[in-house]
From Swiss-Prot:
The modification Omega-N-methylarginine is found at R12. CDD domains: Peptidase_C19 (cd02257). Zn(2+) 3 binds at C166, C169, C225, C229. The lineage of its organism: Eukaryota, Metazoa, Chordata, Craniata, Vertebrata. Residues 453-471, 1510-1524 have a biased composition (Polar residues). Pfam families: UCH (PF00443). It comes from Mus musculus. It is an enzyme of class 3 (hydrolase). It comes from the Eukaryota. Deubiquitinase that specifically mediates 'Lys-63'-linked deubiquitination of substrates with a polyubiquitin chain composed of at least 3 ubiquitins. Specifically recognizes ubiquitin chain in position S2 and catalyzes cleavage of polyubiquitin within 'Lys-63'-linked chains. Not able to deubiquitinate substrates with shorter ubiquitin chains. Mediates deubiquitination of PLK4, maintaining PLK4 stability by reducing its ubiquitination-mediated degradation. It catalyses: Thiol-dependent hydrolysis of ester, thioester, amide, peptide and isopeptide bonds formed by the C-terminal Gly of ubiquitin (a 76-residue protein attached to proteins as an intracellular targeting signal). One of its GO terms (molecular function) is cysteine-type deubiquitinase activity. Its EC number is 3.4.19.12. This is Ubiquitin carboxyl-terminal hydrolase 54. Residues 382-519, 555-577, 601-624, 801-834, 1089-1182, 1221-1242, 1491-1561 are annotated as: Disordered.
């Protein structure tokens, strides 16, 4: 309000000036009051703070030494104790438990202020005052309490007269005397009047505040003319005393009213009593100015207090135990209230010159006999008395406002019953003293006493009356004259008053136009009364209804039926009352609810009833008056507080006239009332009715609370909307409208989805998401609304993901499957998870031959990559929507990733054709691929995975790198336990499609990881192979051995890396699968297209390379054989669990197992690697290798995402993908199978990428990931061409290009570049991939990948399942899924699926080498000695800016560019430490020790053509561990770390290689080293093509 400033400015200084600081002893430092959870004592604490800080009360209370003690329910004693603590305690926070307990016991019968139950602060304040009155005053003599030492009545109570005077006919209603502790005003009326005043006055002034309050208190409270002349007149209130503290209670229509800010602005800090009431009879009151010193506020079911600390002259804020200094100015409070949305509830205006009460008249202590509890019940609140009952009823009704009113209802005293009731709690004492039975007589006697006292008051103040009525001839007249003839000047004054108040009336009427703004929207929090609709119509503001229809009905008949002794004005008044009563009941009846009995502001209702009462005080005999009022009030009072009768304002003339009349009438009435049995019986009935109704209200309250609790928060959320939102009511409507629209759109989307129109459903779902996001902004101010919208938004997002997954799956299923149908089908078929649930899975991104290292070094490499066909089929099944589940379940550790895949993809979406291809039954939706492989919830999947890990012996954890690898693996299987195989969780491919790579899933159980390491990779990896396949495999084995020996170092390096990584990383990388990013279908399709393009190229390359690869690396080629039926058999064979009961991913096997991998790489433990689960490690190695290859292949892929380029440090997925891609090439299958396997590698890559996806994967990361993925796939292609080399866990030699021949992913890519369909040299493609902007759709973005990585294998599986992957074979997690394929990496880059898994576009098949994706946080698999290395920017492949070899022509370099990716073993936050050797240096192992073998040669594989022999693969000695030695490399001591920003923009031509030494524990090597049969040749070619 514009005039608020005037108020504040005028009063601000005066407040400070008037209140002189007290002595330090006067008030102790401010202390807080405790409010423990569940106590809900904030309302009491607020009232206590107000009482303590009111100087007048504190000083007066200090003087009181005697009281009527009530024992443990004595509020006076409790209050004394707390005040003493306030004064003397050194504690900053004091307990209020004693007072809370006493309060609860005092009002136990009324069920008010009970322990643990929130109540109303204003009512509590009022009742405390009344309790004090009862304790220190003689109630029998003080119905109106004239005791000088009664703080409540001497300092707080307002003695008022209320009367209506008709300006037309001069008729007057009987004056209604009453006392109120709190003057209640409707906030709605206040705001309406403020608007009216502003409209009428140009310059508002602080003096307007009093007038504003007066107009607001009577606004809309129009009465029918007492003589029923048809006029509507306003109540007049006259203040007869001079209270030093005025308490203004603001009645709110809702807990979260939109008027809060307006009300705060409209508050003035200075209040003149003369302005507050129509007339003031006390001279002191006329001159007194009170200043705002305290304010109790409410917000969010919590009360707090602002108080002006006179000692420091600053406003303080008390919030239970918290005390805060606000500032010296009121505006500081206003600012805080507005920011906090506080609703002022109680305003305390105090006279700065106020004095404490006089204690001279204190009765001796002996006079105060303690009341026994038996006599004293909580009813003493006065509710049980005539008026008390009314009050009690109202209070019981639960409306806090009612309680406040009841204290204000002291006015009820004005109503006979109110006599006692005005002390809302007061009369109970009296009643208790007298038996309840006697309550009739006592109540009647009290009524008589009250009337007498009132009449005496009136008589004793004739001068006051005369003063007020200046010139009124009737001042001295007898009541009879008054009864018969109102003074002439009275009507005139009335007219004048009407004229004065017309403005307010007009305002009220005119304010109706503002009603919409002020109309309360919600159930009132503190208000017991509701604005009646009728009043709204008439007055322009909603009036509080005090009584229900019954009450109204009762009231009308009572009034009608009750004959009045004097009918002089009776007829008119009676008829009036009838009319008024009926009209009123209508208004009140509207929405009347007993619990909703609302406190009228300052007795709107009571005044109405009084005015409407048929008998005027003069005309009606006191008895009749009592009867009428009691009945009319009482019955209504049952629902309506007696304060309905409370007079609101009287003109001075009225007072004069009424003074005598009331005296006479009251005197007449007294005897009658004494003798009247009827009145007593009525009182009793009224009490009973009140009690009954109060109980009903309590029951209703309880039911409502129960309903609210059942609904979770609030059945009417709008009630709890924030003030900001309420202040913008239009916005709330918009919010609801938007929410409804979003809901309808979402429902339509569901409908379309049911019809099968996923695209349209997704579009609508996205639209709903957009609307919900907008709505979320609108609901930002409402916690409840925000939660509601957020919930719906999450549901919509999940649905969008589901739809995208389905579409991707459909697309994948539609895409042609590679020759190794099982792989592609698996990859494509992998259902995309409707929603990804975080599951920690350790996944060898791809498994070729099982990683179990062959005891023989040469076999070791092969065997480590070797995976039985059975495992492949299982892998395939896992890849398939159901199969992923099964594979996951089967491969418990790897299963994690598979679970992730499952999570990512819906089994439904799995390509069923893939199942058929795999020889697996086509499973619909989430049907089991294998009996073992059911689609289960992630938890179930984990269990399954663990279970299936055992079962999936066939699903060896290591995909056969190549036919030879598979053969070796099979051989090793023979050597090793199938349990080992079962440990391995490679995805099975269809028969003949043994994936060269297997994905090892490790559920998030360290045991599985540890167990897996212990299990020989061979057994875990080797699937049961058909005799033919196994012979082939065996046959392949020798070749593989040779190639492996050649490539052993590289493969071992890669495998070792894998093993190391896997060993370091428990299989069960427990990565919470991040929810797959919901990507637009466009993005998905983009990825698919990009991936498919790359895959097509890659698959072409791969397919060519497969043959070529076979030729180039016989061992690699051998795996394709294993991919054959034998592999299929392996696929179906269940791998026994590791001793842990978990399948060990081959990677996790001991370094000994990995040494076979190190054959080619030169790992001393190549054989051991084979023996161990090198395959498990191998997939990792492959993945690592794949990254190496991927760099090459990425470039080669060109279109493929530049995983390496854009991959953020934490983008595990990309690294994994790179590794997978490399791995896939490492395990070339026979001929086309390889290419199909390539697609499988793609799937593997998908699996891989999810494996390491970081939970916090973001789109930037995704972009980087996609770039890295491109590189990775390129390297994968190259690595897929190269045979997987066994690698020891210790000797995780990072062999970017040390892929032998086509066996190396890089080699494969190289091969594919020259001889494969790849049009670009691998280097070029890799370079393109590396440098090209991430072509992968956003879904493939590194962020997605990263997130997927955190999800670990799950996402990988999911992404493989993503329909985006046209080539189902692309399964990041399970190399098994991919039959051994040529090492040529398909140009396609694995793309992150919506599920978060990378996938290759359909059509690009590539065998994926097993890659164990490990997070830094994951534990190292037990028994695995591999040092882990975190993938980082340096560790990831990049090309040095200076290296021109990275150009498209430098395939070899590109292959080399794919660098070993080291991944922290099991840490969810995956850090990729991909070390990228300088181009000129070729791939370099971070440490000579770890890389020594891997990098025997410059690690620069010569560009390998698709037809190039395995020798083309780079050979990198594995002897050096990541941490053990500097990376070989002319340019940089070691490979570059991707996790660290390169010195130069690594996306540009150069990658400064920085060797970063990581402790094995800190990082896991995530690179797959491919066998390097022709590693030297590859190295030479690579060196030729690239200059590191």
């Amino acid at each position: 309000m514009s005039w608020k400033r005037n108020y504040f400015s005028g009063s601000r200084g005066s407040v400070q000036g008037m209140f002189a600081p007290r002595s330090s002893m006067s008030i102790a430092p401010s202390k807080g009051l405790s409010n423990e959870p569940g106590q809900n004592s904030c309302f009491l604490n607020s009232a206590l703070q107000v009482l303590w800080h009111l100087d007048i009360f504190r000083r007066s209370f200090r003087q009181l030494t005697t009281h009527k003690c009530m024992g443990d329910s004595c509020i006076f004693c409790a209050l004394k104790g707390i005040f003493n603590q306030f004064q003397c305690s050194s504690e900053k926070v004091l307990p209020s438990d004693t007072l809370r307990s006493a309060l609860a016991k005092t009002f136990q019968d009324e069920q008010r202020f009970q322990l643990g139950i929130m109540d109303d602060a204003a009512e509590c304040f009022e009742n405390l005052l009344m309790r004090i009155h009862f304790h220190i005053a003689d109630e029998t003599k003080e119905d109106i309490c004239t005791a000088q030492h009664c703080i409540s009545h001497q300092k707080f109570a307002m003695t008022l007269f209320e009367q209506c005077v008709c300006s037309s006919c001069g008729a007057t209603s009987d004056p209604l005397p009453f006392i109120q502790m709190v003057h209640y005003i409707s906030t709605t009326a206040l705001c309406n009047q403020a608007i009216c005043m502003l409209e009428k006055r140009e310059k508002p002034s602080p003096s307007m505040f009093g007038e504003l309050l007066q107009n607001a208190s009577t606004m809309g409270d129009l009465r029918n003319c007492p003589s029923n002349c048809g006029e509507r007149i306003r109540i007049r209130r006259v203040l007869m005393n001079a209270p030093q503290i005025i308490t203004i209670g603001l009645v709110w229509d809702s807990e979260h009213s939109d008027l809060a800010e307006d009300v705060i602005h409209s508050l003035g800090t200075c209040l003149k009593l003369g302005d507050l009431f129509f007339r003031v009879t006390d001279d002191r009151a006329k001159q007194s100015e009170l200043y705002l010193v305290g304010m109790i506020c409410y917000y969010g079911k919590h009360y707090s207090t602002f108080f002006f600390q006179t000692k420091i002259r600053k406003w303080m804020y008390f919030d239970d135990a918290h005390v805060k200094e606000i500032g010296p100015k009121w505006k500081d409070v206003v600012t805080k209230c507005i920011k906090g949305h506080y609703q002022p509830l109680l305003l305390l205006y105090a006279d700065p010159q106020g004095t404490p009460v006089s204690a001279q008249d204190l009765p001796p202590h002996a006079q105060f006999l303690p009341y026994t509890k038996t006599c004293y019940d909580s009813e003493d609140s006065g509710h049980l008395t005539d008026s008390e009952c009314n009050q009690k009823h109202t209070s019981k009704k639960g409306s806090l406002v009612e309680r406040r009113r009841s204290s204000g209802r002291v006015r009820r005293k004005g109503d006979e019953p109110q006599a006692s009731g005005y002390h809302s709690e007061g009369e109970t004492l009296k009643e208790k003293q007298a038996p309840r039975n006697a309550s009739k007589s006592s109540s009647s006697s009290r009524l008589k006493d009250f009337k007498e006292t009132v009449s005496n008051m009136i008589h004793s103040r004739p001068s006051l009356a005369s003063q007020t009525s200046a010139g009124s001839p009737c001042v001295g007249r007898a009541g009879d004259q008054l009864d018969k003839i109102p003074p002439r000047n009275f009507p005139l004054q009335a007219r004048g008053w009407e004229t004065e108040s017309t403005s307010s009336e007009a305002k009220s009427s005119s304010s109706s136009k503002y009603r919409p703004t002020w109309r309360p929207k919600r159930e009132s929090l503190n208000i017991d009364s509701i604005f009646s609709k009728d009043r709204r119509k008439h007055c322009g503001y909603t009036q509080l209804r005090t009584f229900p229809e019954d009450a109204a009905k009762e009231f009308t008949p009572d009034e009608v039926s009750k004959p009045t002794a004097n009918d002089i004005k009776d007829g008119g008044s009676r008829s009036q009352h009838k009319l008024w009563g009926t009209a009123r009941p209508g208004s009140h009846l509207l929405e009347q609810h007993p619990r909703l009995i609302q406190r009228m502001e300052s007795g709107y209702e009571s005044s109405e009833r009084n005015s409407s009462s048929p008998v005027s005080l003069d005309a009606a005999p006191p008895d009749s008056v009592n009867v009428y009022r009691d009945q009319s009030t009482k019955r209504p009072v049952g629902f309506v507080p007696s304060w309905r009768h409370i007079p609101k304002s009287h003109s001075s003339s009225i007072l004069e006239v009424d003074c005598t009349a009331p005296m006479t009438s009251w005197t007449k009435t007294q005897p009658l009332s004494d003798g009247e049995v009827t009145s007593r019986s009525e009182l009793d009935e009224l009490q009973e009715e009140v009690v009954r109704r109060a109980q009903e209200q309590e029951l209703r309250k309880k039911r409502e609370k129960e309903l609210e609790a059942a609904k979770g928060f609030n059945p009417h959320p709008s009630r709890y909307m924030d003030l900001d939102e309420l202040q913008n009511q239009g916005r709330s409507d918009g919010f609801e409208r938007s929410l409804q629209e979003a809901n309808s759109i979402f429902e339509e989307s569901l409908h379309l989805e049911q019809k099968g129109d996923c695209a349209a459903a997704l579009a609508l779902c996205n639209e709903a998401i957009s609307k919900l996001r907008l709505t979320l902004h609108d609901a930002s101010s409402s916690t409840h609304s925000r939660a509601l919208v957020d919930k719906k938004l999450q549901i919509s997002i999940r649905k969008a993901r589901s739809l995208q997954d389905r579409m991707q799956q459909q697309a994948s299923s539609q895409q042609p499957v590679q020759p190794s149908a099982s792989l592609p089908s698996q990859g494509g078929a992998l259902p995309q998870p409707t929603s990804e649930q975080p599951i920690t899975l350790q996944v060898l991104l791809n498994q070729e031959a099982q990683l179990e290292p062959c005891k023989d070094t040469e076999l070791g490499a092969t065997s480590s990559f070797f995976h039985s066909p059975a495992s492949c089929p299982e892998l395939h099944s896992s890849l398939i929507p159901e199969s992923p589940v099964s594979s996951v379940s089967q491969h418990s550790p790897p299963g994690t990733s598979s679970l992730k895949l499952l999570t990512s993809f819906e089994v439904d979406s799995v390509n069923r054709s893939a199942f058929h291809r795999q020889g697996l039954p086509k499973a619909t939706g989430r049907t089991e691929m294998n009996s073992q492989h059911e689609c289960l919830p992630l938890d179930a999947l984990e269990d399954r995975l663990q279970g299936h890990r055992e079962d999936n012996s066939c699903c060896s954890k290591f995909p056969p790198r190549e036919g030879r690898d598979i053969a070796q693996d099979q051989l090793f299987e023979g050597k090793k336990n199938p349990a080992d195989i079962s440990m391995g969780m490679p995805w099975s491919y269809s028969t003949g499609e043994a994936t060269s790579e297997r994905v090892i899933y490790s559920l998030n159980s360290p045991s599985s990881s540890s167990a897996q390491p212990s299990i020989p990779p061979y057994s875990s990896c080797h699937p049961i192979t058909s005799a033919a396949s196994s012979p082939v495999l065996h046959a392949a084995d020798p070749m593989q051995k040779l190639n492996q020996h050649v490539q052993a170092q590289s493969l071992q390096t890669s495998l070792t890396s894998k093993v190391v990584r896997s060993s370091e990383e428990p299989y069960r990388l427990e990565f919470p699968s991040t929810k797959g990013l919901v990507r637009s279908l466009a993005e998905q399709f983009q990825k698919m297209q990009n991936t498919s393009t790359r895959d097509v190229i890659g698959s072409q390359d791969r397919s060519l390379p497969n043959g070529v690869r076979k030729s180039s690396s016989p061992s690699d080629f051998m795996p394709p054989l294993s991919q054959g039926p034998g592999r299929e058999h392996c696929r179906w064979v269940k791998q026994p669990r590791s001793p842990d009961g978990r399948e060990r991913p081959p990677c996790w096997e001991d370094p000994a197992a990995h040494p076979p991998l190190s054959m080619g790489s030169g790992l001393p433990d190549g054989e051991t690697s084979r023996t161990a689960q090198p395959r498990l490690a191998e997939p990792d190695m492959y993945q690592g290798k794949l990254p190496q290859v991927t760099d090459i292949r990425s470039k080669e892929l060109g279109s493929s995402v530049n995983l390496g380029t854009s991959l953020p440090l934490d983008s595990w997925v990309n690294v994994t993908r790179l590794c997978d891609s490399q791995v896939k090439p490492s395990a070339p299958g026979p001929g086309d199978k390889s290419s199909s396997h390539d697609s499988h590698p793609r799937a593997t890559c998908l699996e891989r990428s999810p494996i390491l996806l970081h939970p916090h994967w973001d789109q930037d990361t995704e972009q980087e990931t996609s770039e890295l993925e491109s590189l990775y796939q390129a390297s994968l292609q190259a690595s897929s061409h190269t045979a997987y080399s066994d690698w020891r866990s210790q000797d995780v030699a990072w062999q970017p290009l040390s892929l032998a021949g086509s066996a190396d992913g890089m080699g494969r890519r190289l091969h594919s570049a020259p001889g494969l369909d790849l049009s670009k040299p691998l280097t070029a493609e890799m370079e393109h991939v590396l440098y090209e902007p991430s072509t992968v759709p956003v879904s493939q973005d590194s962020s997605n990948v990263r997130k997927k990585t955190l999800e670990t294998g799950h996402h990988c599986s999911s992404s493989s399942s993503l329909p985006v992957i046209h080539d189902p074979p692309v399964f990041l997690l399970d190399p098994k899924l991919y039959p051994p394929q040529p090492q040529f990496l398909s140009p396609d880059v694995l793309m992150p699926s919506m599920a978060g898994e990378p996938y290759r576009p359909p059509g690009t098949s590539r065998s994926v080498h097993q890659f164990l994706a490990m997070c830094d946080r994951d534990e190292t698999p037990q028994g695995v000695k591999y040092t882990g290395r975190t993938l980082n920017y340096r560790s990831l492949p990049h090309r040095s800016r200076t290296d021109a070899s990275w150009g498209p022509g430098s395939e070899t370099n590109q292959h080399i560019g794919a660098r070993v990716l080291t991944m922290p073993a099991c840490k969810p936050q995956l850090t990729y430490t991909a070390t990228l050797p300088e181009r000129h240096q070729g791939l370099q192992v971070p440490h000579a020790q770890s890389w020594g073998n891997l990098f025997h040669s410059p690690s620069h594989p010569s560009a390998v053509h698709p037809g190039s022999p395995p020798s083309s693969n780079l050979h990198v000695p594995l002897r050096s561990t990541w941490n053990s030695g500097p990376v070989l490399g002319s340019r940089t001591p070691g490979p570059r770390r991707i996790d660290m920003p390169p010195d130069d923009d690594w996306r540009q031509s150069s990658y400064p290689s920085q060797d970063r030494h990581r402790s094995p524990g800190e990082e896991r090597i995530m690179f797959a080293l491919s066998n390097a049969a022709g590693r030297e040749q590859n190295r030479v070619r690579f060196l030729q093509h690239s200059r590191w």
